[in-house]
Amino acid sequence: MLIKMVEKQILKLSKLCEHWAAHNNSHKESYVKWRDVAREVLNLPTVVEKLNKAIEMMDKSTEYLLSAKKELDL
């Protein structure tokens, strides 16, 4: 019984990691869109730099989430 409960929690956490990674990607698309607006329309180079950093961090977060999922799926 306890083993089944642990397996169920591992499966849930794996699915959450996958969901969070996908959610990050949808946010990233929006960040990229608005970074481009900040660059091309609004001419806000410091905002562009900060959005680029946020995009990099989002990519890193997604990488960690997918790595955790892979470990859970072993």
Kindly label every feature range from the protein language model.
Residues 33-74:
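Short, charge-rich amphipathic interface segments used for partner binding and complex assembly
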